[in-house]
């Protein structure tokens, strides 16, 4: 019915609920996408690593690497994935920030260096990926 299909903007203001975090995340994602021209650029998306069992997706667009961990409980302390280059990267966004209702489990101060990995036989980055998060790395 119409009664249940309408938007309820007042939910964001109820601090007992978590909608304020969702609203903050939504505003930041729009800001992030606009500042990095993610949707305007016609560059293709390059799949770097997909693991259905561990529920991980890593892809690259422009100079950004997106790491999605969709697993509801498993965090990966030594997630290693190929980068197809030998650059260094730094985290510029992660969905685990406390302003989004997260736990601040990802350090923003670490520089990740792409080094040769024998498992993949190419340059890789090793990173901590908490459960139910997205991390975006930018090439330095």
PLM features: residue spans?
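Carbohydrate-interacting/catalytic domains
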Residues: 1-140
């Amino acid at each position: 019915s119409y009664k249940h299909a309408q938007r309820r903007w007042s939910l964001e203001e109820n601090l007992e609920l978590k909608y304020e975090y969702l609203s903050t995340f939504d505003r930041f994602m729009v800001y992030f996408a606009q500042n990095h021209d993610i949707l305007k650029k016609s560059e293709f998306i390059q799949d770097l690593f997909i693991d259905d069992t561990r529920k991980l997706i890593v892809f690259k667009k422009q100079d950004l690497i997106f790491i999605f961990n969709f697993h509801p409980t498993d965090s990966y302390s030594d997630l290693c994935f190929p980068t197809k280059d030998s650059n260094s990267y730094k985290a510029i966004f992660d969905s685990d920030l406390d302003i989004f209702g997260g736990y601040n489990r990802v350090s923003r101060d670490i520089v990740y260096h792409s080094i040769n990995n024998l498992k993949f036989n190419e340059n890789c980055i090793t990173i901590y990926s908490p459960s139910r998060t997205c991390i975006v790395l930018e090439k330095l």
